[in-house]
Amino acid sequence: MGQGDESERIVINVGGTRHQTYRSTLRTLPGTRLAWLAEPDAHSHFDYDPRADEFFFDRHPGVFAHILNYYRTGKLHCPADVCGPLYEEELAFWGIDETDVEPCCWMTYRQHRDAEEALDSFGGAPLDNSADDADADGPGDSGDGEDELEMTKRLALSDSPDGRPGGFWRRWQPRIWALFEDPYSSRYARYVAFASLFFILVSITTFCLETHERFNPIVNKTEIENVRNGTQVRYYREAETEAFLTYIEGVCVVWFTFEFLMRVVFCPNKVEFIKNSLNIIDFVAILPFYLEVGLSGLSSKAAKDVLGFLRVVRFVRILRIFKLTRHFVGLRVLGHTLRASTNEFLLLIIFLALGVLIFATMIYYAERIGAQPNDPSASEHTHFKNIPIGFWWAVVTMTTLGYGDMYPQTWSGMLVGALCALAGVLTIAMPVPVIVNNFGMYYSLAMAKQKLPKKKKKHIPRPPQLGSPNYCKSVVNSPHHSTQSDTCPLAQEEILEINRAGRKPLRGMSI
């Protein structure tokens, strides 16, 4: 081997594992950290050991093997035994764009990010329901300022950026907000959640009982009407709900009103509160009761019309069932699954619409094949007198319900019915596994977040210092600042990070 080949060879020690390659290989990706190792003055810019003739980096050796192979082959693959965030950090350190990951490994690389987005989508209330934390904390038992700030940030935007208690409002606002919003924030929050759950169940039970004949006796009523020359008494009969059910509903509404007002007053972010669909449901379910009580004493015709309309829209009370999503993880998982599977549901609707249109048309003409000459409309021997009627039959058949109110009576119609049933099974079976997988993913993430131990303190890594082995000093020492190949963007980012840390030094860190 010639002397020129020896001078082109370079040794890189990453985490105790030595890697050998050629400088020409490192030059294939200019502007990256490894490309700077191929420069003549790299010995003064990185941690170089002249005795071992190697550069040292205290990084993950297994990930570096894949990164070095990217320089050799031009294809960047993601190791299956490395967590996604770790691989992402290594790519950022070596200055490699994540979009260079091969398509075969992109799903593996994106898996961790999708999981993080799924966890973040669960929103404010944490899924950690540790009994020890619940018993230890209360609205008056708070931890340090960091715990209060973290709790407030989880639930909404904080009015106190520094998280320090300063006054009655700043101290009690996040606690009372968590008391009514986060059932797992404290022991007393659990009591409030149990009370809310009890009133929800009582209200829904009362709503259902009000429709039973046993609780709606028929009473005789009289009404005096004004006529041209006097008055006229009109007798009529009307179903009237038992009074005790109205009283029970009134007690439930009083609790819901108190809960809603407390959440409105102590909400840190009023705009986000108004946009929340559950809060809109709470308001819509409460309002008709007060309007009905206020208008029940009026005798005008307009008031009676409005009162009759309010009695019709009592069904909005059933929407309170959605309040249970605050207390049950499974319901939240189902909601996130439905939102995440919107594309699959749209695809299913499109497939069903196409199938309904096709088979409704086919069954209409198939049933007309056997029509008698004296019955040109085929109304005597078939239920399918037109195509729109066939839409109902096609929907029932493709969804495998089969009510039996409409069915084909000719051999050609039976053949179309069989094809319609088979097509419906295949159409529904295609998007269902995707929806089931989404539910399984969200449920596993919810269980993982529920069992995740509470982190007391978060370690803040020390920023790279000037002269550090992992610090790229090319921007400081190199006289070239003109092109991307002569400028180290990684060093620029690290210098900006040091400058930011120098302007606002962190506790326990020396700059």
Swiss-Prot record:
Tissue expression from the record: Detected in cerebellum. Detected in brain (at protein level). Detected in brain.
Residues with the Phosphothreonine modification: T483
Membrane topology (UniProt): Multi-pass membrane protein
Disordered: region residues: 121-147
Biased composition, class Acidic residues, residue ranges: 130-147
Entry PTM: N-glycosylated; contains sialylated glycans.
GO terms, biological process: cellular response to xenobiotic stimulus; cerebellum development; corpus callosum development; globus pallidus development; optic nerve development; positive regulation of potassium ion transmembrane transport; potassium ion transmembrane transport; protein homooligomerization
Catalytic reaction annotation: K(+)(in) = K(+)(out)
Subunit and interaction comment: Homotetramer. Homomultimer. Heteromultimer with KCNG3, KCNG4 and KCNV2. Heteromultimer with KCNC2. Heterotetramer with KCNC3. Interacts with the ancillary subunits KCNE1 and KCNE2; the interaction modulates channel activity.
PANTHER family reported for this sequence: POTASSIUM VOLTAGE-GATED CHANNEL SUBFAMILY C MEMBER 1, VOLTAGE-GATED POTASSIUM CHANNEL
Name the record gives this protein: Voltage-gated potassium channel KCNC1
Source organism: Mus musculus (Mouse)
GN (gene name): Kcnc1
